[in-house]
């Protein structure tokens, strides 16, 4: 049995990146070879050397919504903070509301000048709330004007430019957090990668807050992931199958791309097919990868499901050794931090 403690490490607080670097691609890149255990310190732009003509680089094109709203109860003036998690249907959303005790079923909330209103419809087991919005106009436009970017709890500084918490290829609205491994790519770097003969392929997974939810059980097998919506189009599936048939590698950018590809690979016995749905796949050591052959990812929180996923691919000992190396070399950690490439 693997315990949550097996994935713990001491991280000096000053290594938690609070702001993005001026140039996206100037972050550092720790390249780890899982077969030999070799590690190389590089810069992110050097990912170009790690990709081979004929490979597919698979990226998550989800876009982060300004999903944090500040509202009040019209009858009392009491303030509430609402974080949108998942659009369940129509104008109905799963949310987290603070303070939760003020948000009973039937509670009305208004935002801004009242052009956006909501009513609490249901209380969920884990403390979340289902709410239904009422408004005139286009919901996303109202959200853009009233909402704030929901930065992770470990980032204490305000973000000057909200676009820095979006990838340059973000297109599909729906995430409560950025797929941060993609934040390092610039449009120029993607053009260089394409010019090398690498196929750029996009899928969608809308990142929920399960990403930041700590593992609260000791035996990791008892942890349940939050479900997240994913989609792989016919066109993307066709590209990936062509790459596979020609002997190229499937290289994923980030844990969200990995979880989407492996959800599909698990569902279709190792084959890649167009698909969409909800996934709660939890990848831990012992899992046999069916699609992904190499990937880039940021440095994650101790004891997190993301460190467990990296350990499933590279092995727990090598993963923790790579993290120790990154700490000694003062790599920057978490959402705005540096990256690793594992092959």
Curated annotation (Swiss-Prot):
It comes from the Bacteria. GO terms for molecular function: S-adenosylmethionine:tRNA ribosyltransferase-isomerase activity. It is found in: Cytoplasm. Its main location: cytoplasm. GO terms for cellular component: cytoplasm. It catalyses: 7-aminomethyl-7-carbaguanosine(34) in tRNA + S-adenosyl-L-methionine = epoxyqueuosine(34) in tRNA + adenine + L-methionine + 2 H(+). Keywords: Cytoplasm, Queuosine biosynthesis, S-adenosyl-L-methionine, Transferase. GO terms for biological process: queuosine biosynthetic process; tRNA wobble guanine modification. Pathway: tRNA modification; tRNA-queuosine biosynthesis. Its EC number is 2.4.99.17. Transfers and isomerizes the ribose moiety from AdoMet to the 7-aminomethyl group of 7-deazaguanine (preQ1-tRNA) to give epoxyqueuosine (oQ-tRNA). Monomer. Belongs to the QueA family. HAMAP family: QueA (MF_00113). This is S-adenosylmethionine:tRNA ribosyltransferase-isomerase. The lineage of its organism: Bacteria, Bacillati, Bacillota, Bacilli, Lactobacillales.
């Amino acid at each position: 049995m693997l315990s949550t403690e097996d994935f713990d490490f001491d991280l000096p607080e000053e290594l938690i990146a609070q702001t993005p670097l001026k140039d996206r691609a100037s972050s550092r890149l720790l390249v780890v070879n899982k077969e030999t255990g070799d590690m190389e310190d590089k810069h992110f732009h050097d990912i170009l050397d790690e990709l081979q003509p004929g490979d597919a680089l698979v990226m998550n094109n989800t876009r982060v919504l300004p999903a944090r709203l500040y509202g009040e109860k019209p009858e009392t003036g009491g303030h509430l903070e609402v974080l949108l998690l998942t659009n369940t249907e129509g104008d109905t959303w799963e949310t987290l509301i603070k303070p939760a005790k003020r948000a009973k079923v039937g509670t009305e909330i208004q935002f801004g000048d009242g052009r956006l209103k909501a009513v609490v419809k249901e209380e969920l087991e884990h403390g979340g709330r289902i709410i239904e919005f009422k408004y005139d106009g286009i919901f996303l436009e109202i959200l853009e004007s009233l909402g704030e970017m929901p930065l992770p709890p470990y980032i204490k500084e305000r973000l000057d430019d909200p676009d820095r918490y979006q990838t340059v290829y973000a297109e599909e609205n729906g995430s409560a957090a950025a797929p941060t491994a993609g934040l390092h790519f610039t449009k120029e770097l993607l053009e260089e990668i394409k010019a090398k003969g690498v196929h750029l392929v996009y899928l969608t997974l809308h990142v929920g807050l399960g990403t930041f939810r700590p593992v609260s059980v000791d035996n990791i097998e008892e942890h349940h992931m939050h479900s997240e919506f994913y989609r792989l189009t016919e066109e993307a599936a066709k590209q990936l199958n062509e790459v596979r048939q020609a002997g190229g590698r499937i290289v994923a950018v980030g844990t969200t791309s990995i979880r989407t590809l492996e959800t599909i690979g698990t569902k279709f016995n190792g084959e890649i097919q167009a698909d969409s749905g909800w996934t709660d796949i939890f990848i831990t050591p012992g899992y046999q990868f069916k699609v992904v052959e190499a990937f880039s990812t940021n440095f994650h929180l101790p004891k997190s499901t993301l460190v467990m996923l990296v350990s499933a691919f590279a092995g727990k000992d090598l993963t923790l050794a790579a993290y120790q190396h990154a700490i000694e070399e003062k790599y920057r950690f978490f959402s705005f931090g540096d990256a690793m490439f594992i092959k």
